[in-house]
Amino acid sequence: TIPRGQWKFSADRGSVEMAAGFEPHRIYEVVYTAQDPVLVGLGPAAVRDFHSYLKHGDTPVAPVRRAYAFGTSQSGRFLRTFLYYGFNQDEAGRQVFDGVIAHVAGGGRGSFNHRFAQPSRDAHPYMNSFYPTDIFPFTDVEQTDPETGLTDGILKRAAETRTAPKIFYTNSSYEYWGRSASLIHTSVDGRSDAPIPENTRIYMFAGSQHGPASFPPSRSIGQQRSNPNDFRWAMRALLAAMDRWVREGAAPPASIHPRVSADTLVAPEAVQFPKIPGVAFSTRIHKAYRADYGPQWKSGIVTSEPPKIGKAFPMRVSQVDPDGNEVAGRHAAAWDGTD
């Protein structure tokens, strides 16, 4: 912590100055007392009410019988937040969305419903680590964190009101390394697979990145060229599968993802990545930490800033074969849309 007397806000209050200068390659974070927060939290209510109106209201504009929600990355985390707070029940107690597809959201939710929330913030290995995005609970089913004693689940409220939709969680390989995806289907201690509700499916696209690159792949900031492995064909098949599931009750393909019980979901240091010329394999991974934002956090008010940080949750990733390819998950070249 840098003493307050060694730095100051600039005249326009838009930047920070320090007489001694800033060290290169370090990330500085300013903690200060703010005022006059903008109104946040209306988004989930607006999404709920608009789709409830289309589905249940007396409207000749666009009457619908079934409503599906799809979100990618940040909007996927929005949908997990939407479900967690019970917004899939409208004010009349009716179900809003029949089906939800949260894509490449990993284990996160988001800053969409608390004072001074910044929706665009999401935790990464090198920045924004302690913003309230990757926080307990992670699984749809209720679990108890032995470290804090908290018991909760993403679908706790929806299960109580019988308004839980049918759900697909789809993730790329990256989300297991950079977005804590393993937490959505493991026990809190990471030693076993967590139960998955009948209304939920989890799919992992092996050997893929957060969003497929164009082909031929180009160089970016990474060690290797961007990954063009395209999972959008499978996403189209899953959309059709979701529609059949809701309309006809036809069960979609079973969940497919790395599992602790199959030794395909392991700690990063246990990955048996082969030695490949020109490839440097790193076991550095984004971690989700137990964070205490203060006694009013349940009401959406942060009173402990920075938060009090506890132990990290155990992160797990997919094991690889002798060629370095992930052994679990959906392999695009081998999947024809059936299970």
Where are these regions (language model features)?
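C-terminal His-loop and adjacent cap/lid subdomain of alpha/beta-hydrolase
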Residues: 1-339
